[in-house]
Amino acid sequence: MPSVQNYKTFVNSLDFEKIYKESLPILNKLYPNISDFYKKYTYPCINNGTVKLLYNDQKIIGYVLYSIKKRILKFHFYYITPKNRNRIYGRFFREQIFEQLKNNVDSLETSINKTNFAALNAARKTAEKLELDFLLKKIENPQYICKQYVCEIKKKPLDNLEDVCDSSRE
């Protein structure tokens, strides 16, 4: 059965080290300078406790490095092992992360390779299931090796806010 855990030093740090090493070939394809990625994202996420780990039957199968700024949850890197990369685990992982952090965030942003149709579709379906808005923005940044979209999933604005808050009309 899948589960999501927060990264904790001396509790599951060896699991994270193992899965991180496994993800390095993919990181190297996406980011030309892996040591810069480590300094900018991995190290701060470890120190800030913003790493979530995905397990299936007590075995590590994925992780995400994220940050929260101005109520925006931003995935810096999201990885699930190739053997377990499917709708069940991916959707479960995203939904659990958003559910755990939903009181602290209004939206989720992540970049997705524009040819990764499965990931784009999965992000859209996650937004639908959680009843959130879904938006894609093209990234025009020469530092990225592959063309990517920023995928934004956010809470829907309340319609008729005054009707919800104003009890004097009854």
Walk through the language-model features, giving the residues of each.
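Conserved beta-strand in the GNAT
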Residues: 53, 59-67, 74-79
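Conserved acetyl-CoA-binding loop-helix of GNAT-fold acetyltransferases
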Residues: 80, 86-99, 121, 125
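Alpha-helical elements of Rossmann-like donor-binding domains used by nucleotide-donor carbohydrate transfer enzymes
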Residues: 18, 22, 40, 92-96
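Conserved active-site alpha-helix within GNAT-family acetyltransferase domains
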Residues: 114-136
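C-terminal "cap" of GNAT-fold acetyltransferases
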Residues: 133-170
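Active-site rim helix/loop that mediates acceptor-substrate recognition in acyltransferases
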Residues: 30-53
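Conserved GNAT acetyl-CoA-binding A-motif
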Residues: 101-114
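Short amphipathic alpha-helix that is part of the acyltransferase structural core
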Residues: 1-36
